[in-house]
Design a protein with these regions (language model features):
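Cofactor-/ligand-binding subdomain signature composed of acidic, glycine-rich
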Residues: 1-39, 61
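Cofactor-binding active-site loop characterized by glycine-rich and histidine/acidic residues
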Residues: 27-30, 37-167, 185-191, 196-203
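Short, ordered loop/turn segments at secondary-structure junctions
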Residues: 70, 176-179, 211
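A positional/architectural concept
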Residues: 161, 171-173, 177
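Short, proline-centered helix/strand-breaking motifs
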Residues: 170-172, 205, 210
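Conserved catalytic cores of soluble enzyme domains
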Residues: 180-184
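Conserved small/polar residues in nucleotide/adenosyl-binding loops
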Residues: 212-218
Length: 222
């Protein structure tokens, strides 16, 4: 993560630029999807721009990121050729993954974006293993695993959180809570009101942030 804890005017403008890019990219993508140009499912980051940029922007190029099925905003923030990203989602051979990954399997190894994952909770084990490798190699790099609140209901979340706590791994589980897993509300799928409280059971440091403050708080804490 970046060593500086105070955001400069230049950084704030760069973050705003990223948020605008995410919004316009996904809005254009929505139009293409409605016209039948995109095969399969695609999940937009509209409304979550600040949550994505605020958390991912402070990362260094060397830090590793594992995203989820709703990874457009995180992928754009970490860094990618926007034309290759669009081509990938459209299934073109000029895409980042030659058109074979699509919306839910974007990646860019040049900036250590280790890939999005179409399986809910699919990044838990991958990111935990990567964090263990970073610790063993003493790289000083941090691993960030992005997910929605429903992914914290998966058994792998609790297993990996427990292992990360025991081994003191350089791993951040970043949860964007939009209150719903498809059509299932948080109230019907879990008894905790604050998802962040789940970390306390494993003695893992945690904090909760409102979207409009996430950039400032992630920079100061990470």
């Amino acid at each position: 993560m970046s060593n500086s804890k105070k955001l400069t005017k230049k950084e704030l403008l760069e973050m705003y630029d990223k948020m605008l890019l995410i919004r316009h990219f996904d809005m254009e993508l929505s139009k293409l999807y409605s016209r039948g140009f995109i095969h399969g499912m695609t999940h937009y980051s509209v409304g979550e721009e600040a949550a994505n940029v605020g958390a991912i922007y402070p990362m260094r190029k060397e830090d590793l990121m594992y995203s989820n099925h709703r990874g457009h905003g995180q992928t754009i923030t970490k860094g990618i050729d926007i034309n290759k990203m669009m081509a990938e989602i459209l299934g073109k051979s000029t895409g980042q993954c030659k058109g074979r990954g699509g919306s839910m399997h974007l990646y860019n190894l040049e900036v250590n974006n280790m890939g999005c994952n179409g399986i809910v909770g699919g990044g838990h084990g991958l990111s935990t293993g990567a964090a263990l490798a970073q610790k063993m190699k003493k790289t000083g790099n941090v691993v960030v695993c992005c997910m929605g609140e429903s992914a914290t209901n998966e058994g792998s979340f609790h297993e990996c959180l427990n292992m990360a706590s025991i081994w003191k791994l350089p791993l951040i589980f970043y949860v964007i809570n939009n209150k719903y897993g498809i059509s299932m509300s948080q109230q019907r799928s879990m008894t905790v009101e604050r998802v962040v409280d789940r970390a306390e059971a494993y003695k893992v440091k945690s904090f909760r942030s409102e979207e409009r403050r996430v950039g400032k708080e992630c920079r100061s804490r990470w």
